[in-house]
A protein has these predicted regions:
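Active-site acidic carboxylates
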Residues: 1-92, 110-113
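Glycine-rich phosphate- or other oxyanion-binding loops that anchor nucleotides, phosphorylated ligands
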Residues: 92-110, 115-118
Length: 119
């Protein structure tokens, strides 16, 4: 059975940007340590991705805080996390939800904001 790690939305806006918190900043080193326990072919990451019209979207109406606009500093993965990920697959996601990994049987998640986005 292949075990994978999915690193969820470890982006600057969720760590120290428009939706950041001290708690989010505090977990960065732990997420990096977790990434480093996996081989890179077993690590995937998600990146919350919005466009300039975010506030006019359904999500933007419910959470009217501009964040993770594609191409901005806030959209980028945290520098330490990006370095640990190396060439791992990073998937942009435009909204709440999930993606299918049909061949994967065991998934472990690390990242932000798990209470709102993925699970």
């Amino acid at each position: 059975m292949k075990k994978i790690l999915i690193v969820v939305d470890m982006q600057n806006d969720f760590i120290d940007g428009s939706l950041g918190t001290p708690e989010a900043e505090a977990i960065v080193d732990n997420v990096v340590a977790k990434i480093n326990t996996y081989t890179k072919d077993c690590v995937y990451a998600t990146r919350d991705t919005h466009q300039d019209n975010y506030l006019q979207t359904q999500e933007g109406e419910n959470l009217p805080i501009v964040h993770c606009i594609e191409g901005t500093y806030g959209w980028q993965l945290n520098e330490k996390v990006q370095a640990a990920l190396g060439s791992a697959v990073v998937m942009n996601k435009p909204s709440f939800g999930s993606w299918e990994l049909a061949d994967m049987m065991v998934m472990e998640f690390a990242g932000l904001p798990a209470e709102e986005c993925e699970i």
